[in-house]
Amino acid sequence: MKKFICIMPTSVLESHVYEAVGNKQLFNKDTTRFPLTPLLTGYTESNEEIQVIAITATGDARSEFNVSLLEREIVNKNRSGKVTMIAVDFSAADGSLELLTKLIPLLEDGDHLYVCLHFASTTVQFAIISALQYAYRALRNVSIECVCTQGESGKYQNVDITALVQAGELLQTLTERHHKDPAKILRMTLALGEEEDEGEE
């Protein structure tokens, strides 16, 4: 199943047009409160069933209200499926570990994973990426399709960092196999990816 993971902020959200950086599928000319929306519209078809995993702050009414707004947005974009809410106490020292323990059980064999890291602290981003890496390695037929985050301060952008996450996975594998020149393999992989991109244009 296609699963979309995002963080619900504790603030009032304004609508913006999010510029796609590094991935044409994130292009979306419409204004939206949620930077997740371009992932939904770029990677799914109308009436396609999906699951959204929305991470909220424990006991925060605004964060939970933003989930209800997201549910409406999904319906307005003609997508179907459920929104699963994970409440996490981010004020606690082990909040990111709590997130990991709640997120990992929701990832299953055959999942195609899409992640919007907007509104996430550095530790929360690390926890989510760790969960992705677990799913990719421990489960069957899991793919990390798109990971995006915010761009420069003051700009409304969706910056695709999927290649960086995948490179981290590749380096981990090469390390386990005691490869003598992991940088060379990484360069070759990046060059191959660039050739494929040119072929698509």
Label the predicted regions:
Residues 122:
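Polyanion-engaging groove/track-forming segments
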